[in-house]
Amino acid sequence: TIDGEKEIETEALIIATGATAKYLGLEDEKKYAGMGVSACATCDGFFYRKKIVAVVGGGDTACEEAVYLAGLASKVYLIVRKPFLRASKIMQERVMNHEKIEVLFEHNAVGLYGDNGVEGVNLVKRWGEPDEERYSLPIDGFFLAIGHKPNSDIFKDYIDTDEVGYIITDGDSPRTKVPGVFAAGDVADPHYRQAITAAG
């Protein structure tokens, strides 16, 4: 650990700063962090065995998380902002045909509630429309699957990144266009974001 500024000379630099899950920006997400709010179904799903959970998102990741959680929970609500899923056709079919998953299209999560942890989510259906509807849905767990932000901001003036911020490497190699600089793990991996692939 370096306190303050220090210049270090090295023959190579490996950037492995990871990626951080995106949140909705609700104050309640911080309040219930570790008490019902999670951004990793494979990490925390087992806490919700035979319980009711909600997953926020409409892409492949959200659908995968919903299917995974459906193997543990008694009920999974998939909260989708749009009137359709953005996931691949096969993932859409898995979700829509799963008896434990209910998709709530055109819904926005606007808050969470509970005394000692998450006990429910406040929803708005068809936000801003004449038939807008607000209601509360009892749940035990709230999972976010709306993407990740790579922790690459401090390198953007020196290293090429894609439009999201993932560091661009040379194909399957960790090499960047800057000689001696490599990127490993989630900061350069927009697809898998798992410890096993980050370590590989």
Language-model segments: residues:
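Phosphate-coordination loops involved in phosphoryl transfer and adenosine-cofactor binding
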Residues: 49-51, 106, 178
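An active-site-proximal "capping" alpha-helix that borders the catalytic cofactor pocket
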Residues: 196-200
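N-terminal Rossmann-fold NAD(P) dinucleotide-binding loop
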Residues: 62-63
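FAD-site-proximal beta/loop scaffold in flavoenzymes
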Residues: 20, 25, 30-47, 145-193
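Nucleotide donor/acceptor-binding cores
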Residues: 12, 35, 50-52
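Generic hydrophobic/aromatic pocket-lining and core-packing "Φ" positions
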Residues: 66-67
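A Rossmann-like FAD-binding core segment of flavoenzymes
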Residues: 1, 7-8, 15, 71-171
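Glycine-rich Rossmann-fold phosphate-binding loop(s) that bind the pyrophosphate
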Residues: 57-59
